[in-house]
UniProtKB/Swiss-Prot annotation:
GO terms for molecular function: ATP binding; ligase activity, forming carbon-nitrogen bonds; zinc ion binding. It is an enzyme of class 6 (ligase). Keywords: ATP-binding, Ligase, Metal-binding, Nucleotide-binding, Queuosine biosynthesis, Zinc. InterPro entries: QueC, Rossmann-like_a/b/a_fold. It comes from Prochlorococcus marinus (strain MIT 9215). This is 7-cyano-7-deazaguanine synthase. ATP binds at residues 12-22. One of its GO terms (biological process) is queuosine biosynthetic process.
Length: 224
């Protein structure tokens, strides 16, 4: 798949994964249109990081969409009455940081935007190996959403579908960090923490997964 001179809408949250996708697209000489969401999340600092990444890569356009999912909550990221789990990553359990329907909503908005500007791809930083168990970050979800997207708009019906591009889907977080460096992503400017503090808490799932991967990458790098 070549991205050179193609238009791509990237869901840019400001985190490690979406910033890496942006870096890969930039290095591939794609025309990047960034889309971020102010959805009532407690970690709004990610929006600042998203804007920094957008400027760093000098993308074509960057939009922040206001879409308040805190109106009905259902997640510790959008409901401050719920505590973010800090006891460590648990396997085979979907944590309460899962936001009901978030990726489905975000990708749907991105699909509308992509069709409106005649973009060829939607770039997603979803990752199936080191994720926290979210149902909307898995390969079967991406496959089914692509099938839906092909039916849901004019381009799809005319056999020129907008494709979901998920370059990180089968990578572990250590591999993503390596890819981030090779694509000139300023990792110090990205934001992964869920807790909403001015500095990363180091205890939430997102911090733990990122920090563990960084230590592995650092150790492996020092051995070379």
């Amino acid at each position: 798949m070549t991205l050179k001179n193609k238009s791509i809408v990237v869901l840019l949250s400001g985190g490690l994964d979406s910033s890496t996708v942006t870096g890969i697209a930039k290095k591939s000489e794609a025309k990047i249109f960034g889309l971020s969401f102010d959805y009532g999340q407690r970690h709004k600092k990610e929006l600042y990081s998203a804007s920094i990444i957008a400027k760093h890569f000098n993308i074509e356009e960057f939009k922040i969409i206001k879409l308040d999912l805190s109106l009905w909550g259902g997640s510790s990221l959008t409901d401050t009455q719920k505590n973010i789990p800090l006891e460590g990553v648990q396997t085979n359990k979907i944590p309460n940081t899962y936001v009901p329907g978030r990726n489905t909503i975000f990708i749907s908005v991105a699909l509308s935007y992509a069709e409106a500007i005649d973009a060829d791809f939607i770039g997603l930083g979803v990752n199936a190996l080191d994720y926290s168990g979210y149902p909307d970050c898995r390969p079967d979800y991406i496959k089914k959403f692509q099938e839906l997207a092909d039916l849901a708009n004019k381009r799809g019906r005319e056999n020129n579908p907008i494709k979901l591009w998920t370059p990180l889907l089968d990578l572990n977080k250590e591999e993503i960090i390596k890819l981030a460096y090779s694509n000139h992503v300023p990792l110090e400017k990205t934001w992964s923490c869920y807790s909403g503090y001015s500095k990363p808490c180091g205890k939430c799932d997102s911090c733990r997964i990122r920090n563990d991967a960084y230590e592995k990458w650092l150790n492996n790098n020092n051995k070379k």
